[in-house]
Amino acid sequence: MRDLILNALLAHYEGQIKMAKANVEIFLENAAGVGEHNDILETIDVEIAKIADAEDKIDVVLKHLKIANPRI
């Protein structure tokens, strides 16, 4: 059960990274088409912060919590 929960967290963090990466790619490819985002640099910075946060959480789980079979 423990590994199931920790792997679910890891999958959640990986999903957050993928979503943020997709958003960055969309903003980079079609910045003009995203009308509600006036400051594209700030918007991309927010997405990069989401990636950094999720990566930090993955690192903490892998470093500090023993997990038999991490699925990442």
Residue ranges and their predicted role:
Residues 1-72:
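Extended, charge-rich alpha-helical interface modules
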